[in-house]
C-alpha cells in the first residue's frame, strides 16, 4: 500500500475548504474555497510537495558535476534545474535541490547518492516550501525580516539564509510568467506558526492563499 505524504501545512488549509489533489505523493490544496487570492497583488501557496534532496561535504560539488547537475559557482547562490527545479549552494560545501512539477533531478540525485560516498554525505530535507508572489511581496518581507529584499538584484540569483519572524529560512527570488515571486523554505517544525503569521500579514495587505492548480502544471 502506498501512503500519501502529509504537508507540514496540511492543517492550515482545513478552514479554507480546499479541493485536495495528489502531487508527488502528497495531498496538496489545488484550489481553495471561494476564489483564490489575486496572485498579482499578494498570494501565498504551499509547495511542500515538491521533492527535495540535500548533500554536503568537501567533495559534494565535484560529485554533483559528475552527475550532470549544474552547480552554482558561488556560496549562497542558486541555479535553475530542468523543468523549474532549483539548486542552492548553502555555504561552500552544502547543497539543497528541489524538483519542479515535472522535474526529477533532485530525486535522481538523492537516489544516486544513497547513504553517501567518499567526501559526500546526504542531508535529509523535509522543508516546508512556500511561494510568495505579488506586487506587495516586499511589503510583507519588510515586516517579517531585516533583509531588504527590494534592494537585492534578482539577476544575481542569491540564496539568502536568514530569519523571518524568528524562524530560519532559505529565500530566493524567482519568477512566474510576468510576475516576480519568492520561494521560501523553513523547518517543518515551525511551518504552521510561520504560515499563520505570514498569512495574517498578507490578509492585512489585501492578499491571501492560492492553490497549486496553476503553479504545478
Predicted regions and their residues:
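Basic, glycine/lysine-rich polyanion-binding surfaces/domains
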Residues: 1-217
Amino acid at each position: 500500500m502506498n501512503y500519501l505524504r502529509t504537508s507540514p501545512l496540511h492543517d492550515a488549509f482545513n478552514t479554507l475548504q480546499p479541493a485536495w489533489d495528489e502531487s508527488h505523493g502528497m495531498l496538496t490544496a489545488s484550489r481553495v474555497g471561494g476564489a483564490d487570492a489575486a496572485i498579482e497583488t499578494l498570494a501565498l501557496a504551499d509547495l511542500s510537495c515538491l521533492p527535495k534532496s540535500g548533500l554536503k561535504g568537501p567533495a559534494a560539488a565535484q560529485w554533483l558535476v559528475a552527475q550532470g547537475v549544474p552547480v552554482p559557482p558561488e556560496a549562497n547562490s542558486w541555479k535553475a534545474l530542468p523543468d523549474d527545479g532549483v539548486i542552492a549552494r548553502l555555504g561552500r560545501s552544502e547543497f539543497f535541490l528541489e524538483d519542479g512539477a515535472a522535474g526529477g533531478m533532485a530525486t535522481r540525485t538523492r537516489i544516486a547518492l544513497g547513504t553517501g560516498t567518499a567526501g559526500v554525505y546526504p542531508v535529509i530535507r523535509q522543508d516546508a516550501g512556500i511561494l510568495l508572489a505579488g506586487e506587495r511581496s516586499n511589503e510583507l518581507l519588510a515586516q517579517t525580516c531585516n533583509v531588504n529584499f527590494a534592494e537585492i538584484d534578482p539577476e544575481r540569483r542569491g540564496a539568502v539564509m536568514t530569519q523571518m519572524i524568528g524562524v530560519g529560512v532559505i529565500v530566493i527570488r524567482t519568477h512566474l510568467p510576468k510576475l516576480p515571486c519568492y520561494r521560501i523554505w523553513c523547518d517543518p517544525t515551525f511551518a504552521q506558526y510561520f504560515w499563520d503569521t505570514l498569512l495574517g500579514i498578507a490578509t492585512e495587505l489585501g492578499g491571501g492563499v492560492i492553490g497549486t492548480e496553476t503553479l504545478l502544471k
